[in-house]
Amino acid sequence: MDVLELLRVSGSNMYYSTFLADAWCYYISNQITMTMYLYCALGVLSMLFIGWFVYFKRLARLRLRHEIARSLSAVTMASGGDLRGPRFRKRDKMLFYGRRMLRKMKNVSGQMYSSGKGYKRRAVIRFARRILQLRRENMPLEVRTVEPPAEYLEETMEGSDRVPPDALYMLQSIRIFGHFEKPIFLRLCKHTQLLELMGGDYLFKITDPDDSVYIVQSGMINVYISNADGSTLSLKTVRKGESVTSLLSFIDVLSGNPSYYKTVTAKAIEKSVVIRLPMAAFQEVFKDSPDVMIRVIQVIMIRLQRVLFTALRNYLGLNAELVQNHMRFKGSSQGAGPSVYCSQTTRQATGSASATATAAAASGTAGSTHTAVPRPASSLSRYSQDEQHTLSDPNPGIPNLELSGDSVNTLFGEVNGGARLNSYPPLYHQRESDGNLSTRRGSITQQEQPEVGPVPSIDMRLVKSSAVDSLRKELGLPEQDAHIIDPFVEVREMEPNVTLITEGNADDVCVWFVMTGTLAVYQGNADATRIKQDKTDLLIHYVHPGEIVGGLAMLTGEASAYTIRSRNHSRVAFIRRAAIYQIMRQRPRIVLDLGNGVVRRLSPLVRQCDYALDWIFLESGRALYRQDESSDSTYIVLSGRMRSVITHPGGKKEIVGEYGKGDLVGIVEMITETSRTTTVMAVRDSELAKLPEGLFNAIKLRYPIVVTKLISFLSHRFLGSMQTRTTTGAPGAPVEANPVTHKYSTVALVPITDDVPLTPFTYELYHSLCAIGPVLRLTSDLARKQLGMNIFDASNEYRLTSWLAQQEDRNIITLYQCDNALSPWTQRCMRQADVVLIVGLGDHSHLVGKFEREIDRLALRTQKELVLLYPETASSKPANTLSWLNARPWVTKHHHVLCVKRIFTRKSQYRINDLYSRVLLSEPNMHSDFSRLARWLTGNSIGLVLGGGGARGAAHIGMLKAIQEAGIPIDMVGGVSIGALMGALWCSERNITTVTQKAREWSKKMTKWFLQLLDLTYPITSMFSGREFNKTIHETFGDVNIEDLWIPYFTLTTDITASCHRIHTNGSLWRYVRSSMSLSGYMPPLCDPKDGHLLLDGGYVNNLPGHLWRYCRASMSIAGVFPPFCDYRDGHLLLDGCYTNNVPADVMHNLGAAHIIAIDVGSQDDTDLTNYGDDLSGWWLLYKKWNPFTAPVKVPDLPDIQSRLAYVSCVRQLEEVKNSDYCEYIRPLINKYQTLSCAGCPETYGLNPSDLFSEDEDCDGYISEPTTLNTDVRRYQVPRGGNSLSLSETEMDMDSDVEMDLKMERKMDKATQSTPPLQSKAQILRRKHSKEEARHEWEIKREQKQELAREQELERERELSQKGTTAGATGYTPNAVIATQTSLIFMDEEDEMDKKKTKDNDRDEVRGSAEDTGKEKEEDKENRSNTNNETKNYL
């Protein structure tokens, strides 16, 4: 909240309509008198206390004297009355008084718990506690631990003692070729040899045969590369357990082509022992196990593609450098070509080879890994025959093929917008978006309209025969096997610019053989999406006659990463993917020839990189590198998930970031040559590629473009890290560390009990995720159906892992539905999951089952989140969430999900599948809790931040209405000060009517003066004790915890004990809301019960951000007005959050929100101050102030200066939020309302949302320009009627008739504010009649506009459905909706004209009323005052 206006004590301030300012002035004027009275009262009380103390002391002495005298008289009587008789001996005296004292102590101890002096003492203590407020309330239940468990941040230190070191090193080294069964591994071990090298000895030199895999058992080996000028560069240093090998040489050796070292040498740095494994050993194994050979070649091709043709291109900018510029044609293919391929009618000269040839070997690869299911032989043969029959028919009526952005005709038909000919369906029914694909296709420039001409019938037999013979030779098949491929070979003749396959297409992958003409290979610009320019595809290379293309995509089974078009009139022969797989079953050796064709295209640079690359496999919990280790390499995550953890000097560990597939790890530390700043460990089983420092240096020297690419890449990382550090403040975090983004690729779903409807829940979540992008749902039954009943056996582990990796690559998210028991499938789901969702029923028992504990044991480092389901018919809100969380300390986050009735219906599995087969055809509800959960999992959550501003915060109600009408869902809410109160109300109710009602009731309570007067106290810390203020917030929320809210919520307070801001995501709601509203000087800070820290209004450091009411109260602790709120957890004092961050959009972004709407209602400082020179006289200011004939000066007074100093941090944070690219900053028209004018809240609640904004940034009510955060982000469809200015009657939050009457009455009152005051009775009647007519006309126009808006919305839906562009790609962007739905926020021009017309009519009717009598004037005033009073009473 803001204290600028309140602290300015001036007699000219007449706008303070609250008693608070008057009370403050009264205190200042009577301070001396009050202090004197107080000192007198304290003096009297002190004297009474001293007199009471002296009296009792003297009374005790008198009693003691009487006892002594009585004892002496007794002794005298015993001695015969002679005072001079025997005296009272000392020992007898000691015994006597000892017995007396013991007798008294016994009596006192017996009376302590009954009555007497002990009872009085306890009564005094109780009275003192009541006076000094030392009582301690019963503390509510709290979360036991909010920190992650120790295993979550620690690596696994267990070793593999059962395996000998040499066997372990060899096993790890040959894993780059895939998984080998134990018998095959033992056969390979028989061929190993041990080599002992001294320092300086060569392991291999140039011209030595490259036919072995070398594994360092001990010592160190340095690998060098020789340049053309004779100089050498170090590529990498091979240490213990690492290997030296080349995957490309491995394929050469298997293909029968001898390979030699041409530019690479290896020398021992010190005495070393090396294990040598000849590659010929693999040939013997592959003869007996051809299926293993196919698997090994596929693994090699996949890894080469992911690193060489993805990582080096994206991170280093290498394209043309990855392939050879020229390739020698095979004599057999080229010699037989021209005489057979070309005919008199179709022959055309091919273009000259271009020098810009680039990644030819990779043409037709990339994207997601998914292998299509091959068709049966009969269907493929019949399919090919039909296709040949169509081609052999000399029908000239073949349609033209055109290239456009929306619909691209390819060789197989229309890709987008029409049915694709001869395309195979995917493995599963998935809902995918073609938005990215259409963008890539549309970027190819069409030169002329292409046509596909039929092959003349007279040449068809010879052309087909020659094509079969050429493809047979390319595949390495003998002549007698020509009949195997003959049914699958197809021939096409194309005009220029015909697209064979598009980038990202996985259905039309083929092996293409060029017979005549030339094919052009293109690839999308990797920087186009980032720099928003140069979006045309890059020309990679040309494919000439006798060359084959598409082998890499065929071997990897992934989608094509390139677009292939005919450059001129061309004729091609091709075999489809399913046919190749069928041929591969009969002749497995064709994979070697396809792989060899890929390898022959690669440049020497790729081979050198292949020697330097290392492939690393990490099990869950293993460390990639540790903090303070030397950094000599960087890593590329190929699969899995990594976590970066920093260890502080005190031993505390903190998460810095997480890395997923495709991320680069440790590059900044390697380039800067500094030690590792964090420890990086594997969250789950992961695969990485290691790029050493020497390789980077060699590439930088040869290709300077790499330096430019690295600078651009590191600049973006540095900018992102700077925005993160401003809020997190982690000084030791590396620059390239990613924040812990909540974007997962694999999700495991685990039921707590058997009665949890896990299958319907998975279907509902799948339905919501389909609106964001391609998603896949996997169960144990589906896995067995696709891969066989024995797929979960140990022998099939690699096959299952590879298949799951392909599914994960093809989809943005994969759902793993676990079984209800600890089956092998459940264990596999735990190993594959990035996050585990533990699903339970919210109204059932919270006890932890045995199965759930086993799940935690299997995935120690995997993040786990709790999902509690509630029926839609449930009348109560979530409760007892703390019991669920305390029983599961391993849970890091929880979600409350409201479910429809069909989820809890007891049905068989077959009926459930049948039900959701129909449900999946409908559009998901983007406002449902399932959609909110889907956006959270994919990293597309939408956050709403409500800033502080005192009574101006009532405008948040109007903003909530506007957001609701615009169809924008709210996934997370954060607030400060009054924003904490409004945000907590929305998260608790999620109904604008209830929120408005409770907010009005709270505002009415704040305007009751007699309650506030009773709360006044001696202003040492604050003006008010805060007891009544606590009561109003407590009555609003009750004993609700933040954990029980439907929507994730946080509030921000200022901790004056630790001098920082605090973010509250759990605990007592009302307390932290109260603390966030503790404005300094008015309320005492709230004492945090956790640690005893004092918390103030969070707006002092960041003005846009247990039991629920406590933290709400803490967030509203206005310093000086209300006392700081003491946190019941640690005792820290909490104040209003506006002192640190009044609009905590940055905090919301760090909590996982991708798109944020920030609403600022704080006051604006006057920056137009008077320049008074080098010194300032207070007498001169007093003269300027009192002299009405001098020009006024603007000089801040002492309270104003102190207030501005308190808000320095807040202003800086606000500017950063305005300039951020993830936030949409909005400021309504609320400057005319004062910070503490709670009496104006009802008027603010009644404002139309469209009346709160203006397009001028300088004016109050500003909306920042919408920025496009992601061009591929899905824009949800706005609900029908959402684009209309008028409120739909079906969406009215209150009673529609009464609400419209009140709105119309307010508009009429505004129109008549400037009219003359004197009116006759006839004029008053005419004005009322005109009001009714204007109201009727306005309602008619409103209905007409609603109908027109509905018709326009329906028409737009039809157009979108026809174009097929309603599917999304990644998520939802509120900025786009705000940009397109401006009419929902800004004032409608027609409504302005209506109000202006009504105002003019009223002005004309009342004109000439100046001669009316004073009696009529009084009657008119009375009528207007009655009307206003009735309206206010209703509000």
From Swiss-Prot:
Membrane topology according to the record: Single-pass type I membrane protein
Positions annotated as active site in the UniProt record: S977 (nucleophile), D1097 (proton acceptor)
Annotated InterPro entries: Acyl_Trfase/lysoPLipase (IPR016035), cNMP-bd_dom (IPR000595), cNMP-bd_dom_sf (IPR018490), LysoPLipase_patatin_CS (IPR001423), NTE (IPR050301), NTE1_P-loop_dom (IPR056556), PNPLA_dom (IPR002641), RmlC-like_jellyroll (IPR014710)
Transmembrane region(s): 36-56
A molecular function GO annotation: lysophospholipase activity
Residue stretches of biased makeup (Basic and acidic residues): 1330-1361, 1393-1424
EC primary class: hydrolase
Motif placement: GXSXG: 975-979
EC number, UniProt record: 3.1.1.5
Family from the record: Belongs to the NTE family.
Protein name: Neuropathy target esterase sws
UniProt source species: Drosophila persimilis (Fruit fly)
